[in-house]
């Protein structure tokens, strides 16, 4: 059966044809559960749970003292302390450590969404850009305001069955509110039906 013929069948609204697998995939997948999502947000914001999570899943982040300061349906804020655990030989924060905090600010919300739906979400960074504006000293805070855009990308993949790539922005600021670094992370999302 051709794709054109398939589009004329009565079940066209509940099935689409994958361009890579040539097999029917259901479009009526269960959306992200907001109750579970709020619970995941609370868990990641809990200092004890987050420290345990990083110790087990991201030990470098645990050692560096990465912290989740805010996570909701609009934005995510992470921070890292200054000091010997995060510094470079010039006594400022090492650029790769900044990248860790900036990346988590863009990825924490999609990670929570992946745990709030029955389908499997494959997500990974496929590209990044950074601009270093000022020497990073002391506690640096990273803010991403793209949580709604992340949800839209995941829901688009859920609906189409195709991978979706999106750029998310993270801004690093020092304790005086001055920008020290600007980051762009290109995320790739693919929702896979478990059935």
Where do the PLM segments sit?
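HotDog/MaoC-like acyl-thioester-processing domains
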Residues: 2, 8-42, 136-137, 147-195
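Short Pro/Gly-enriched beta-strand edge/turn motifs at strand-loop
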Residues: 46-55, 60-61, 151-153
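Hydrophobic core residues within well-ordered beta-strands of beta-rich domains
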Residues: 62, 124-126, 140, 164-168
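Short structured motifs
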Residues: 62-68, 126-132, 153-155
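Catalytic strand-loop segment that frames the active site of acyl-thioester-processing enzymes
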Residues: 63-93
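Residues located in well-ordered beta-strands
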Residues: 67, 129-131, 143-145, 171, ...
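Hot-dog-fold acyl-thioester-processing enzymes
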Residues: 85-107, 120
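Hydrophobic beta-strand-centered segment that forms part of the acyl-chain substrate-binding groove
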Residues: 109-148
């Amino acid at each position: 059966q051709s794709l054109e013929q398939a589009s004329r069948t009565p079940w066209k609204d509940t099935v689409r044809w994958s361009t890579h697998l040539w097999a029917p995939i259901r479009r009526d997948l269960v959306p992200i559960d907001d109750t579970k999502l709020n619970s995941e947000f609370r868990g990641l914001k809990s200092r004890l749970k987050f420290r345990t999570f990083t110790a087990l899943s991201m030990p470098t982040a645990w050692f560096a003292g990465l912290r989740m300061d805010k996570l909701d349906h609009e934005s995510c804020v992470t921070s890292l302390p200054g000091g010997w655990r995060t510094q470079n030989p010039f006594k400022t924060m090492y650029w790769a450590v900044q990248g860790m905090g900036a990346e988590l600010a863009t990825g924490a919300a999609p990670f929570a969404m992946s745990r709030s739906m029955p389908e499997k979400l494959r997500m990974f960074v496929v590209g990044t850009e950074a601009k270093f504006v000022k020497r990073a000293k002391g506690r640096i805070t990273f803010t991403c305001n793209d949580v709604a855009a992340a949800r839209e990308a995941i829901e688009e993949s859920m609906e189409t069955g195709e991978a979706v790539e999106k750029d998310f922005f993270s801004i690093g600021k020092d304790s005086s509110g001055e920008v020290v670094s600007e980051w762009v992370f290109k995320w790739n999302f693919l929702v896979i039906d478990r059935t």
